[in-house]
């Protein structure tokens, strides 16, 4: 018997079956860096339309986690896909380097020494700490295969960035939008600083819930009542009732607010008179333990205005005032009002001339003037206030409640509302709120669409933007304060001159902290209010959200890689209240336009059960763990596979599925590359019109799937890319087309039309696969590209620079429907053969002959194709459906067809393994006529 294996055109490629990603990926990263792959990708589109994805800066603190890894991979997919689509998309990564978390870490390392060190030294240590983690995270992001300008990222602590941030503040000052005043803001007693809305997280918290009575010995109460009722009221035993979950604010009470239109019940209980909302009376009575009560009258809240109650602890007045925000959802309908500790309280205080009283230090400790509670922090004061109220007889009831309460994003401790002198950007100044809302509706595409309503509601209801922080590590608020009268000097011309110095200074805005007041104050400057000349520098720094929110000015407008406005901002959905929000206000406030055209958000990464990752639960999966076990490619594939616009799950099981999918895609690439050996497109390519029918159809099929994938990239539907690519490789290629043409590729003459026709489709398929894979499976696409025969590559030195000119088949819908029907027929034939294989009657489908009893439509569809090749059998006979034998299989899912499967007749060809008549060629007695003809040339 002759060895005919050598006469077959078997696949030949050095592209390995085993990926060995953990070893190969670092080698490829090194090669990318040495050969400048990122630059080559961008240069390929040097003259093309620019696409700007502006990177939201991650915080330079700690290692990357799954959320930041997913974010960076998503951005990388977009940048690479846009470049491969012919746009010039450059990626400038950035880092947020200022702020409390870094300062906290430095303080922890310094311990008690921090009090002895000047601000300049603390800032130097913060700068070094941030720089260290920029380097750590940069290596971790690069390990994910993310391409970008890693050597020149933007850092919010660079002098040019700090200057740009300060300049934007100057622009707001120039427009008159910056206000300095005393207002209640979120305050963290542990961090000793104001907090922005975006720095507050709401968590479940248990608080004391107390009902308190305020003595109301005022004749005005009697005037509000009918005469017959007034005569029964003993003012010395009359009270207005309030409810609060913050007992510590009772010492700072300045008023009691009622709704002008609500009805209030004047209720007698054991000789005492209580005033509270009529609708809430039954619930309150139960809480107070009243077994019986008598409503003497009801009175509109408006009639109680001006009555003066007495503070429940101190000898101080608490007037009754009107407020529309009072509700009947809970409490008593009478609201304890402390203008120093609540936004609505503050507004009510302004309207009614109440003192904004908040006698505590930055740690939330009551000052000496606060009788009974001096020296206690607010949380220590809670039980003491309750004790005092009980002692003086004004505590009606107390209990514990669990509710959603604001906590500091950094230290995770509960925060308070506290009125302090702060700097604000006024939301009504220059119509900032109105302009921002219009921009949200008219000028930005929000993906998912619900993002629009979310940010619209936030901007619509937000207070003025508190931009000051009482810390060291950040950009200073450039202003001088008169020591004699507290007047502010922030003339824009002077502000911009200081900004210019920041830009020149080696350490940027350290200039402000290093220079003495004499070096900074303009010569001869006198206070315009009092004429004094004693000035001090403003100590506060800018909110880090203002820092990062002005990145459009520092980066998008300034760097050659970008242009304003950016095409896309992409971050987690929490950034509707964070970076998207601050960037919008900063841009609209100075330029009247938003900084972005499209805003795309992703969800959080959770575990397999949908739980948030937490060290305490022990369910944290770090990116490095996945890379060490599977390689970055598998993590990248996972990012593409999930619907990232929602919260996404990750687990070992999910990653195992990714590994299986990856293996199938890799094997498909390897098979195609192996069968392209010896193929030169310039001399061997077959025009679509000259191809074999199935090749023509396959080319059309792959083209259509390629278009689906490219459209999905354009629409940010990466899970659609993943599923289409997976289906193409496993079903439409491996299980269908590649399976069918294997015989022809191996057995036909090396240069025959049959083989070259199939190879042309494989060449085109590989080009499309590379373009479709590269944004996601970047390492594998580059590896596969490096193993392509040189004559197929063109001038591109990297897969990210390929711009393939694809052959376009011309197939009409009728022909497509014909092939879809044929694919269905083939599926049913495969099913019919399977029982024989399972029962070991046959070893391979080539051991069979099939008879198809077909209706007219199916019979016609089967005309003009090489049927034995199509069904991978040794014989095919077509007969009318009416002649179907009893032993024929009748498919349930395809009408008009019956299939009879039997063992093939003839002898098995030693070369192609088909059963046929052998020995027609005396030189090759073991071969079928087809194989003998191939060898005869």
Curated annotation (Swiss-Prot):
> Under what name is this protein listed?
Isoleucine--tRNA ligase
**Pfam families registered for this protein in UniProt:** Anticodon_1, tRNA-synt_1, zf-FPG_IleRS
Motif 'HIGH' region boundaries: 58-68
State the top-level EC class: ligase
Q: Please write the reaction equations for the catalytic activity of this protein.
A: tRNA(Ile) + L-isoleucine + ATP = L-isoleucyl-tRNA(Ile) + AMP + diphosphate
Q: Which UniProt keywords apply?
A: Aminoacyl-tRNA synthetase, ATP-binding, Cytoplasm, Ligase, Metal-binding, Nucleotide-binding, Protein biosynthesis, Zinc
Entry's Gene Ontology cellular component terms: cytosol
Note the subunit structure. Answer: Monomer.
Q: Where is the signal peptide?
A: none
By its UniProt entry, which CDD domains does this protein fall under? Anticodon_Ia_Ile_BEm, IleRS_core
The family annotation for this protein states:
Belongs to the class-I aminoacyl-tRNA synthetase family. IleS type 1 subfamily.
Entry-linked HAMAP family: Ile_tRNA_synth_type1
Name of the gene: ileS
Where is motif 'KMSKS' region found?
Answer: 612-616
Record's cofactor remark: Binds 1 zinc ion per subunit.
Superkingdom as given in the UniProt entry: Bacteria
Enzyme Commission (EC) number: 6.1.1.5
One GO molecular-function entry: isoleucine-tRNA ligase activity
Q: What is known of its domains?
A: IleRS has two distinct active sites: one for aminoacylation and one for editing. The misactivated valine is translocated from the active site to the editing site, which sterically excludes the correctly activated isoleucine. The single editing site contains two valyl binding pockets, one specific for each substrate (Val-AMP or Val-tRNA(Ile)).
Q: Which residues bind Zn(2+)?
A: 909, 912, 928, 931
Q: Which PROSITE patterns match?
A: AA_TRNA_LIGASE_I
Compartments, as annotated in UniProt: Cytoplasm
Q: What does this protein do?
A: Catalyzes the attachment of isoleucine to tRNA(Ile). As IleRS can inadvertently accommodate and process structurally similar amino acids such as valine, to avoid such errors it has two additional distinct tRNA(Ile)-dependent editing activities. One activity is designated as 'pretransfer' editing and involves the hydrolysis of activated Val-AMP. The other activity is designated 'posttransfer' editing and involves deacylation of mischarged Val-tRNA(Ile).
Q: Which GO terms describe its biological process?
A: isoleucyl-tRNA aminoacylation
Q: Which residues form a coiled coil?
A: none
InterPro entries in alphabetical order: aa-tRNA-synth_I_CS, aa-tRNA-synth_Ia, Anticodon_Ile_BEm, Ile-tRNA-ligase, Ile-tRNA-ligase_type1, Ile-tRNA_ligase, M/V/L/I-tRNA-synth_anticd-bd, Rossmann-like_a/b/a_fold
Q: Where does ATP bind?
A: 615
């Amino acid at each position: 018997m002759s060895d005919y294996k050598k006469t077959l055109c078997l696949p030949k490629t050095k592209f390995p079956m085993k990926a060995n990603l953990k070893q190969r990926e670092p080698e490829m990263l090194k090669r990318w860096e040495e050969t400048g792959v990122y630059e080559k990708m961008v240069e390929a589109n040097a003259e093309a339309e620019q696409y700007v994805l502006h990177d939201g800066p991650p915080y330079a603190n700690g290692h990357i986690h799954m959320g930041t890894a997913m974010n960076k991979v998503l951005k990388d997919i977009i940048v690479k896909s846009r470049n491969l689509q012919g746009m010039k998309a450059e990626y400038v990564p950035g880092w947020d380097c200022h702020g409390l978390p870094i300062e906290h870490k430095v303080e922890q390392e310094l311990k008690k020494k921090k009090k002895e060190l000047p601000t300049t030294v603390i800032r130097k240590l913060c700068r070094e700490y941030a720089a260290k983690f920029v380097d750590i995270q940069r290596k971790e992001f690069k390990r994910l295969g993310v391409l970008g300008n890693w050597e020149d990222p933007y850092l919010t602590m660079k002098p040019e960035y700090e200057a740009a941030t300060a300049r934007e503040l100057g622009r707001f000052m120039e427009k008159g939008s910056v206000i300095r005043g005393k207002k209640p803001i979120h305050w963290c007693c542990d961090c000793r600083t104001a907090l922005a809305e975006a720095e507050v997280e709401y968590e479940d918290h248990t608080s004391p819930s107390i009902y308190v009575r305020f003595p109301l010995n005022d004749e005005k109460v009697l005037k509000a009542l009918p005469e017959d009722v007034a005569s029964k009221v003993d003012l010395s035993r009359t009270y207005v009732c309030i409810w609060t979950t913050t007992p510590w604010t009772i010492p700072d009470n300045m008023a009691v607010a009622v709704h002008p239109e609500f009805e209030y019940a004047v209720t007698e209980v054991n000789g005492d008179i209580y005033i509270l909302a009529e609708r809430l009376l039954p619930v309150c009575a139960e809480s107070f333990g009243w077994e019986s009560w008598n409503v003497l009258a009801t009175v509109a809240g408006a009639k109680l205005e001006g009555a003066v109650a007495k503070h429940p602890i101190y000898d101080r007045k608490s007037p009754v005032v009107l407020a529309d925000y009072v509700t009947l959802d809970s409490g008593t309908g009478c609201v304890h009002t402390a203008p120093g500790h609540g936004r609505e309280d503050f507004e009510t205080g302004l309207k009614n001339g109440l003192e904004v009283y908040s006698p505590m230090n930055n740690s939330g400790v009551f000052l000496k003037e606060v009788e009974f509670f001096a020296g206690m922090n607010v949380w220590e004061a809670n039980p003491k206030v309750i004790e005092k109220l009980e002692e003086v007889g004004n505590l009606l009831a107390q209990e514990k409640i669990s509710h959603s309460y604001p906590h500091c994003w950094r230290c995770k401790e509960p925060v308070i509302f506290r009125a302090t002198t702060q700097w604000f950007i006024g939301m009504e100044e220059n119509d900032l709120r109105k302009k921002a809302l219009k921009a949200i509706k008219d000028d930005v595409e929000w993906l998912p669409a619900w993002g629009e309503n979310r940010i619209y509601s936030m901007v619509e209801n937000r207070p003025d933007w508190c931009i000051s922080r009482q810390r060291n590590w950040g950009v200073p608020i450039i202003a001088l304060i008169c020591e004699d009268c507290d007047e502010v000097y922030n003339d824009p011309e002077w502000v911009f001159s200081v900004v210019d110095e920041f830009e020149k200074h080696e350490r940027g805005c350290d200039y402000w902290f290093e220079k003495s007041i004499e070096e900074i104050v303009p010569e001869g400057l006198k206070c315009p209010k009092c004429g004094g000349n004693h000035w001090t520098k403003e100590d506060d720094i800018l909110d880090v959200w203002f820092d990062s929110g002005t990145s459009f000015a520092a980066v998008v407008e300034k760097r050659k890689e970008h242009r304003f406005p950016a095409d896309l901002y992409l971050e987690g959905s929490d950034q509707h209240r964070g970076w998207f929000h601050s960037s919008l206000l900063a841009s609209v406030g100075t330029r009247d336009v938003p900084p972005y055209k499209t805003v795309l958000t992703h969800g959080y990464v959770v575990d397999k059960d949908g739980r948030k990752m937490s060290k305490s639960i022990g369910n944290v999966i770090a990116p490095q763990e996945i890379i060490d076990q599977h390689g970055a490619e598998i993590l990248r594939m996972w990012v593409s596979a999930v619907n990232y616009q929602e919260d996404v799950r990750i687990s070992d099981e999910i990653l195992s599925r990714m590994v299986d999918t990856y293996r199938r895609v890799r094997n498909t690439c390897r098979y195609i590359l192996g069968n392209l050996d010896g193929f030169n497109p310039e001399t061997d390519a077959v025009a679509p019109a000259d191809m074999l029918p199935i090749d023509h159809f396959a080319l059309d099929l792959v083209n259509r799937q390629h278009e689906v994938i490219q459209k999905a990239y354009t629409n940010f539907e990466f899970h659609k890319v993943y599923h289409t690519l997976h289906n193409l490789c496993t079903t439409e290629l491996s299980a269908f087309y590649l399976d069918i043409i294997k015989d022809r590729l191996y057995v036909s003459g090396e240069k025959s039309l049959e083989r070259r026709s199939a190879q042309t489709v494989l060449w085109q398929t590989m080009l499309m696969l590379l373009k479709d894979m590269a944004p996601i499976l970047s390492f594998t696409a580059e590896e596969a590209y490096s193993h392509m025969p040189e004559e197929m590559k063109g001038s591109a030195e990297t897969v990210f620079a390929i711009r393939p000119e694809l052959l376009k088949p011309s197939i009409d819908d009728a022909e497509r429907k014909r092939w879809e029907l044929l694919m269905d027929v083939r599926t049913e034939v495969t099913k019919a053969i399977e029982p024989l294989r399972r029962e070991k009657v046959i070893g391979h489908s080539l051991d069979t002959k099939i008879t198809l009893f077909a209706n007219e439509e199916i019979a016609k569809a089967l005309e003009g194709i090489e049927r034995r090749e199509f069904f991978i059998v040794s014989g095919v006979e077509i007969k009318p459906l009416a002649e179907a034998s009893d032993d024929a299989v009748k498919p349930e899912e395809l009408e008009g067809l019956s299939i009879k499967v039997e063992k093939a007749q003839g002898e098995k060809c030693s070369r192609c393994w088909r059963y046929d008549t052998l020995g027609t060629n005396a030189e090759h007695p073991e071969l079928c006529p087809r194989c003998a003809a191939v060898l005869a040339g």
